[in-house]
Every structure is written in C-alpha cells, then in structure tokens.
Amino acid sequence: GGVGRCIYNCMNSGGGLNFIQCKTMCY
C-alpha cells in the first residue's frame, strides 16, 4: 500500500529520519 512506499521514500529522502519517525509521519 501507500504507507510502505511513504516510509521507503521518507527513509531515502536524505532527511535523516529513522523508520519510527517515518512510520509515524506516514500513518
């Protein structure tokens, strides 16, 4: 779904966010 893609994009955007931060943002 879109959440997995959001997390992947978030973690690879160069913003330095970790998985937990990205998961919180993407949900």
From Swiss-Prot:
Expressed by the venom duct. The keyword Transferase does not apply. One of its GO terms (cellular component) is extracellular region. It comes from the Eukaryota. Its main location: secreted. One of its GO terms (molecular function) is toxin activity. The keyword Disulfide bond applies. It is found in: Secreted. Keywords: Disulfide bond, Neurotoxin, Secreted, Toxin. Disulfide bonds join 6-26, 10-22. In vivo, intracranial injection, elicits scratching and grooming activity in mice. Belongs to the conotoxin L superfamily. The cysteine framework is XIV (C-C-C-C). This is Conotoxin as14a. The lineage of its organism: Eukaryota, Metazoa, Spiralia, Lophotrochozoa, Mollusca.
